[in-house]
Amino acid sequence: SDVYKRQPSCRIQLLRLLITEAASPTMIQCLYSLWETERVQQLNERDYTTLAYELALRIPEQGKEILQTQRQRIHNPDRLRQFDFISRAMTADTLKLDSLFRSLLQAENRRIEPWAATTLSYLNHPTRQDYAVKYIRPALEKLTEVQRTGDIFFPRNWVGALLRNHDSEAAYK
């Protein structure tokens, strides 16, 4: 039946959602096991890279090792450059995070807009919501420049990446 044929696709979509939303230690460990063994053949390199990013943020004591392993799995030079750009946002070092954020405020560091938006999104990841609230005002103050120097859709992506994961009163203010 048609429903049966769509089931594997639905399962992968649910797994992709779980990758970005998992919060319990048990589920994070389960995802780590999936990532470590690469046993879900329906997941592609991008899926495993996203999983590595999420795991690096959710298991910071293993983050460096996770990212190093994932980097070795990437063979496409363009995807490797993308990984090197975005993975800088996975550090637990707040000085490096702040420096990375400041670099995104410079137009030349936003040239590849999808990478910049993804990096900004990880800087404002739900696990960092309290810390990252300080990025909101400076990033919004750059919005006119982002609009002037970027693609027509980039300002919306910039604001979405910045605010999507914030729901605190401090962020609202």
Label the predicted regions.
Residues S1-K173:
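Long, ordered, helix-rich scaffold segments
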